[in-house]
């Protein structure tokens, strides 16, 4: 266990990768601010003086402000941010609607934009650097026949692009910006999907566990010389199938 006395923000923190990440950061001695729409009612975490829970839609600027204020007010800093909140749904390209596009942009792009702006502003004030990790998907780099995801990839591909841009923009200030690109992960998103089929989508023939993704995020959060990196944790899916 580390005793970093640093503060990490995790959006989409009530289940799956987000919940696993909150627990991992707490185990490593971080103060943690976790957000989801109803996280205070989720029952996912034991009470801790090192944990603050903030309800609300991360796609709204007001919620992002509340999250940032919770980190600064309760713990005094923002040292790490993981933009884990996101949505995905599969349709044929011609079936996506304007409402679908707006939902994807709202959560995946605006949800990233507002809280990341608050985090970077605070990191610049602190002058001690910081870490931002975005969550994308291996489908950005390697589309799979039968997995129709063109419109969601507009947003996820955008996150990969902005990851590299921000890494360059803030490198001299010690603010590192990276991304993790998972493949198929054993989370509630896939609870109704046939497991045997899901295993065929990754060359290693396995479904990734939440802990695999969490380990990658923690690594990037703490890897002081890594920035602008997109780390694939997908059983080789980004290489081919």
Walk through the language-model features, giving the residues of each:
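Active-site loop of short-chain dehydrogenase/reductase
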Residues: 5-6, 77-78, 123-137, 147, ...
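Conserved glycine-rich cofactor-binding loop
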Residues: 14-15
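Alpha-helical segment proximal to the catalytic Tyr-Lys
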Residues: 121, 164, 168-172
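Substrate-binding pocket helix/loop in short-chain dehydrogenase/reductase
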Residues: 92-93, 100-105, 198
């Amino acid at each position: 266990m580390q005793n970093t006395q640093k503060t990490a923000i995790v959006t989409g923190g009530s289940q799956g990768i987000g919940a696993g990440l909150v627990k991992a950061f707490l185990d490593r001695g971080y103060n943690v601010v976790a957000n989801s729409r109803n996280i205070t009612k989720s029952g996912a975490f034991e009470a801790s003086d090192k944990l603050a829970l903030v309800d609300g839609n991360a796609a709204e600027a007001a919620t992002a402000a509340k999250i940032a204020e919770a980190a600064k007010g309760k713990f005094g800093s923002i040292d790490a941010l993981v933009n884990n909140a996101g949505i995905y749904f599969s349709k044929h390209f011609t079936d996506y609607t304007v409402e679908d596009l707006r939902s994807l942009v709202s959560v995946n792009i605006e949800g990233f934009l507002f809280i990341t702006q608050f985090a970077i502003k605070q990191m610049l004030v602190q002058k001690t650097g910081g870490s931002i990790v975005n969550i994308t998907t291996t489908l950005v780099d390697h589309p799979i026949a039968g997995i129709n995801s063109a419109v969601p990839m507009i947003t996820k591909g955008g996150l990969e692009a902005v990851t590299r841009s921000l890494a360059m923009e803030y490198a001299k200030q010690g603010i590192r910006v990276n991304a993790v690109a998972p493949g198929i992960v054993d989370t509630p998103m896939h609870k109704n999907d046939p497991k045997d089929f899901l295993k065929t989508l990754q060359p290693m023939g396995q479904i990734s566990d939440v802990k695999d993704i969490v380990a990658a995020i923690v690594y990037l959060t703490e890897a002081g010389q890594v920035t602008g990196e997109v780390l694939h944790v997908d059983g080789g899916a980004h290489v081919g199938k």
